[in-house]
Amino acid sequence: MTNTELFDLWRARAVEDPDLLTELDGIRGDADAINDRFYRDLAFGTGGLRGVIGAGSNRMNIYTIRRATQGLADYINAAGLPKKVAIGHDSRHKGELFSREAARVLAANGITAYLYPRLEPTPALSWAVRYLGCGAGICVTASHNPAKYNGYKVYGADGCQITLEAADAVLAAIDKHDYFDSIELTDFDAAVAAGKIVWIDDKCLRDFVDAVLALRPGNDVSKLKLVYTPLNGSGLEPVKMLLDRMGVTQVTVVPEQEKPDGSFPTCPYPNPEIREAMETGLKLCDTVKPDLMIGTDPDCDRMGSAVPDGKGGYRLITGNEMGVLLFDYICRTRIGNGTMPKDPVAVTTIVSTDMATPIAKKYGVELRRTLTGFKFIGEQIGFLEAEGHPERYIFGFEESYGYLSGAHVRDKDAVNAVMLACETAAYYAAQGMSLLDAVNALYREFGFYRNALESFTFEGETGMHKMQGIMAGLRTSAPKTIAGYKVAEVVDYDTDGTGLPRADVLEYRLVNGAKLMVRPSGTEPKIKVYLSAVANSEEAADAINTAMADAAKDWMK
């Protein structure tokens, strides 16, 4: 069918959501707008679905949700998995609606849907999958994307985002269905009355927080003063529950960002990695003067932070810096209190800081590196569990502000990260040090490992083709020098024998020890460039990264 024919079909059939009809009527005759909504089906992969909320096959709406869920139901029934699925959502627009639509499809296919009655974090969904013995999980979230986005993450029975093989099998099942005529659907209220849709009770969340608290080294945090922002997302309830149980009583929540609001009015891009999202909280810090500011993204799986800079202001801690801070803290405290397991394992990703390597060596920890995406870190926990030794896992992190110190869930967990950050801050405060002092101490001990990230956005069908062309060009005409330094080695993770699954990632290793990696984002229309340098000073390493970034910008033109 042509895009115009698809438009006409959707205008005739997509009648259950008035917002979609209004949108379609508004673009009638606009070829570009119609093409953008219908030129493809919204891509499904290991991250599930993610896209702009709206009308069409390339948008997030009740029809794309139903079709994806029908494919998932077919997969579960064919694979003989437990016929139970846990479902959660965060504060994004239409999150509750999409969750209920997924539950309706599952119930119609003989699968019991366990539904959180209100918004909850992504890690609480990962927890619920294992806690309830489900065959899969669904989390309706677009993480830290702008407000116009929503998404549909799928989890396996292990509580980890589905593997490449499972994603391919689910996609094959999805592709057998159209959007309107082959979807099994039941009435929501009738399914609840029949026990086919079950509300998850509060005990599940309390037990999740208990599991996080069980990982505490136990340092006194009672003197810690904290500013916290959930960025209008799902973090407030579990994080406050955790802090109360820990004994952190001096907590100021950023009022403008306290209540759930899918419009994210104070930060159009609710990502705690960036200053814009943290700016409202940083202004409050000028008045409250906390020891630590913490922000969690809308689905509360990422955590950002800021600490006093010693000059009267506050300095953001990067994801890599927090990762090595927590890694070092966990190692030293577990060795100190005698709880370090035999043959401990930590896991990070290929784009995360190389400082993790000397820290692991110092403490006798095996460090494993995976492809980008916390699902691969969760997969490593599963491998250890299959060997009968999940206790060997002590920590995992990625540069994009994801952390996990236990096997209670199989995804990054900002509730866990808040606990660790508070403990680490209190540990150093007892020694008269701030977290910034601790970061600088690590730099002095291991070298000034500095990292940076450049993102380049390419919207729509034209942008998708341009991204593909850039990656193809870098493969056929690899640069010989970058920022004046010779390229010592090129690693193509799509073709070279790296020991990891094939991935669309290119890595350039320079003669000076610097590194540049290029990959298309799996969830956004972006190419991401990861920069890494180590030098004798922060300024020298940053200068190398800046020069490499300038080179990368030329590639993206």
Task: List where the protein language model places each region.
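Glycine-rich phosphate-binding loop plus the immediately following alpha-helix
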Residues: 155-185, 320-344, 348-359, 414
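N-terminal small/polar loop signature for handling phosphorylated ligands or for N-terminal nucleophile
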Residues: 86-149, 245-305
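An N-terminal, well-structured beta->alpha segment
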Residues: 5-102, 109, 191-192, 197-224, ...
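Phosphate-binding and adjacent anionic-ligand microenvironments
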Residues: 286, 290-292, 313-315, 333-519, ...
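Gly/Ser/Thr-enriched, mixed-charge loops and adjacent short helices
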Residues: 33-38, 42, 150-279, 284
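Conserved phosphate/anionic-ligand binding catalytic regions in large, soluble enzymes, centered on
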Residues: 38-58, 142-143, 230-242, 298, ...
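Short acidic, glycine/serine/threonine-rich loops at helix termini
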Residues: 96-101, 126-130, 148-154, 175, ...
